[in-house]
């Protein structure tokens, strides 16, 4: 079996043991760093659950980025915060929109829900929300599984004093104020993450594996469409996220490890699962 097949098999068996809510879909969260295989895993689970006659709706945290105009305004209003000059971190998503969509599924609404998608190719790679005519439509009442994936799904804000102390002992001490801003915004995501019934965490055995994984992704993309970021740009891109991993992953992993409704999958450098529990 491939690494993906092993992981999918483990998750399907895990899901069989989880209590299912009545009158609404089961909401499965998938969290993992860039390049860990979240989207590929979500698609594979979608396929396998559909084969079992489940009705599946799949979407990503990325689908709920602010519109291009909103992101430009956010960056303009926070010129001294390098962490929000581009999409990615907490504060750059439409949390109200996302919360409303998940609320519809949690309530088992019989009204059709529209789920956006984000077109990262727009505005020269700066990105914008895709045309509404291409949004996904779903009926929460007839949906049995929602798969919601994202790199920071499940992250919890730290005490601001604790974050300041930790930031000052790292190479990110010069952006302490920016880190605190993002940390405050992370609180807005908690009502969203609390709607998840079970969380699967894809965890890198060594967080620096993310650089290699993201480079592999970009090389594959460039081979397919003949455009993309240089290696230097990819490294800078990952650098943007690295303080978030360093400050928040420990808390998430501890929470997942102790929760019987969560599944921790630790990956080696080749994305092979070395621990699944």
UniProtKB/Swiss-Prot annotation:
SUPFAM superfamilies: P-loop containing nucleoside triphosphate hydrolases. It is found in: Cytoplasm; Nucleus. It comes from the Eukaryota. One of its GO terms (biological process) is meiotic cell cycle. Keywords: ATP-binding, Cytoplasm, Kinase, Meiosis, Nucleotide-binding, Nucleus, Transferase. ATP binds at residues 32-39. Its main location: cytoplasm. One of its GO terms (molecular function) is ATP binding. Gene3D superfamilies: P-loop containing nucleotide triphosphate hydrolases. This is Uncharacterized kinase mug58. The gene is mug58.
